[in-house]
Curated annotation (Swiss-Prot):
InterPro entries: Oligosaccaryltransferase, OST4, Ost4p_sf. Residues 26-40 are cytoplasmic. This is Dolichyl-diphosphooligosaccharide--protein glycosyltransferase subunit 4. It is a single-pass type III membrane protein. PANTHER family: DOLICHYL-DIPHOSPHOOLIGOSACCHARIDE--PROTEIN GLYCOSYLTRANSFERASE SUBUNIT 4 (PTHR48164:SF1). SUPFAM superfamilies: Oligosaccharyltransferase subunit ost4p (SSF103464). Subunit of the oligosaccharyl transferase (OST) complex that catalyzes the initial transfer of a defined glycan (Glc(3)Man(9)GlcNAc(2) in eukaryotes) from the lipid carrier dolichol-pyrophosphate to an asparagine residue within an Asn-X-Ser/Thr consensus motif in nascent polypeptide chains, the first step in protein N-glycosylation. N-glycosylation occurs cotranslationally and the complex associates with the Sec61 complex at the channel-forming translocon complex that mediates protein translocation across the endoplasmic reticulum (ER). All subunits are required for a maximal enzyme activity. It comes from Drosophila persimilis. Residues 1-4 are lumenal. The chain crosses the membrane at residues 5-25.
Length: 40
């Protein structure tokens, strides 16, 4: 069975990964949105 400590570590790692994924998505989305009008 999964212990409380293992569950806490898993949830923390998953939370950090999802947070970084959201930050990376917004960073990429913001850069492509600003650079497209300049190229045109």
């Amino acid at each position: 069975m999964i212990t409380d400590v293992q569950l806490a570590i898993f949830s923390n790692v998953l939370g950090v990964f999802l947070f970084l994924l959201v930050v990376a998505y917004h960073y990429i989305n913001a850069n492509t949105g600003k650079s497209s009008p300049k190229a045109k």
